Amino acid sequence: MREDIIEYLKKEIYERSQGPGNKFGEGAYYHIEAVAKNGELLAKKFGADEEVVIIASWLHDIASITDIDLYEMHHIHGASIAEEILTKLNYDKDKINLVKECIKNHRGSVKMDKLTIEEQCVADADAISHFDNVPSLLYLAYKQKGMSIEEGADFVKNKLIRSYNKLSDNSKEFYTDKFNDTMKMFK
């Protein structure tokens, strides 16, 4: 496990999340941190390459927190940024390609086939991470979007339902209790 790279990425992502290009607020770092945590958990559960999943999880949204103008295609730009960073850190070229594919295919809103278990782990970790960051979603709804209490609650509830529905069948089964427990807040 390249702990040196993982530690570097934690700092790099934190710094970028504090920069002027990040228009998603402080919750962006916590989202990425939760993706890395869930990615590691899923990689262990499903037998994926943990190192690739963890590194890809830390890098999956790097483009969108670096420059808001890259957001729409952040999965493509992020793969390029990841390659640049990981090459400088002398990471294995074959693993760089796996990381890039995980980043390119992580978005649930962009229908792309997940060809490897690592890609599925990162995509599922991204979707389920919203359940670890409900306060950030509420902040987004109420503070950043200026929604009423009812509108904000519906926004967050629907976001969580969409996120859960993006999961692979294996991850849905694995996270059923987390989903049900979180949904109790909205009854």
For the regions a language model picked out, list residue spans one by one.
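An active-site-proximal "capping" alpha-helix that borders the catalytic cofactor pocket
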Residues: 35, 73-88
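Divalent metal-dependent phosphate-bond-processing catalytic cores, especially two-metal-ion Mg2+/Mn2+ enzymes
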Residues: 2-4, 21-47, 59, 110-187
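Short alpha-helical hairpin
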Residues: 1-18
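Short coil-to-beta-strand
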Residues: 4-9, 48-56
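Short amphipathic alpha-helical interaction patches enriched in hydrophobic/aromatic residues
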Residues: 17-21, 43, 62-67, 86, ...
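His-Asp-centered metal-binding catalytic motifs of divalent-metal-dependent phosphohydrolases/nucleases
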Residues: 50-68, 74-78, 98-107
